[in-house]
């Protein structure tokens, strides 16, 4: 449940990063595939992915 709530919060804060997380975690896409779907460079995808993972880790840890 904590991940679901954190994803909802991320979507409100940064919808693009939330969409990336959905594509990577739940859609099973690679970074390059997700970058293509989102129309961003692979380097940007990597930065956004690192940020989103860290952000979610902090949010989920704070809810426990």
Tell me the role of every PLM-derived stretch:
Residues 1-11:
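Acidic, proline/glycine-rich intrinsically disordered inter-domain spacer in sigma factors
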Residues 2, 26-27, 52:
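Generic, ordered loop/turn and secondary-structure boundary motif
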Residues 11-33:
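Short amphipathic alpha helix immediately N-terminal
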Residues 27-47:
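Helix-turn-helix DNA-binding module
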Residues 53-64:
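Short, Lys/Arg-enriched C-terminal cap helix and immediately downstream tail that follows
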